[in-house]
Amino acid sequence: MVVLGVLLLVALTSRTGSQATGADPLRIRIPTIEVDAPVQPLIVDENGVLPPPDTYDGTGWWRDGPEPGERGPAVIAGHVDSRRGPAVFFRLADLSSGVRIFVDRADGSTAVFTTQRVERYGKDAFPTDAVYGDIPDPELRLITCGGEFDRKDRRYLDNVVVFAVLAG
């Protein structure tokens, strides 16, 4: 089960410097790790927490942030696994720099990103500014759970974050 509860304060950076263009993400493809999944919009809850997507085989895009390919950090989250087994972002931590990520958008275009790095952060030390903070260029952040699984609380202790830049 993915717990994205550490993603506090996201409302502070909504659509910073970005205008909605009608290019909402519809699908994300990462051939290297066999991801080809729909994207649903996500909004933060009353506590400022970005919830996980409704399904284990789909992903969710932070709707109040930039659209993938627009200025700023677009954020897409997905589950790592479920009680039944691997989920959409099960192999996300296996990515390395230089991998292509394709985001199909509602306007018919595809934003292509290249991974820069993959990091793992404890949920109690999640780098909110590095993930959601205002930046001058179009970038993408992919988030899932990782690290040790706490069986008592039924949650992972870490988040895996992929940082990617728009391919030029």
Regions of interest found by a model, annotated:
Residues 1-2:
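N-terminal Sec-pathway targeting helices
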Residues 5-112, 116-168:
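Solvent-exposed, non-transmembrane regions of membrane-associated and secreted proteins
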